[in-house]
Amino acid sequence: MLDKLSNHIGRQLQQARQRKGLTQAEVAKRAGTNTNYYAKLERGEAVPSLKMLEKIVKALGVKSSDVLPF
């Protein structure tokens, strides 16, 4: 289940980032994290905390409901 969640979140983050025309480094900087961690999120290798997810969706200019499957 966690793999499914992390993969879903990763795909949604990547799509949102690409729609905005941003690089992973730009999103990571805006969210206050490092590029390697953000890249892991997009690949589905990590699940962000709610606090980090809040920062990332703000950096992307989307809502958390756009990223989460529920």
Where do the language-model regions lie?
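Charged/polar positions on well-ordered alpha helices
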Residues: 18-19, 30-33, 50, 66
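Phosphate-coordinating loops and pocket residues in cytosolic domains that bind phosphorylated ligands
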Residues: 40, 69-70
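Short alpha-helical DNA-recognition segment
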Residues: 21-43
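Short basic helix-loop element that most often maps to the first helix and adjoining turn
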Residues: 11-29, 55
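DNA major-groove recognition helix of helix-turn-helix/homeodomain DNA-binding modules
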Residues: 51-66
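A detector for short, charged/polar N-terminal pre-domain segments
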Residues: 1-8
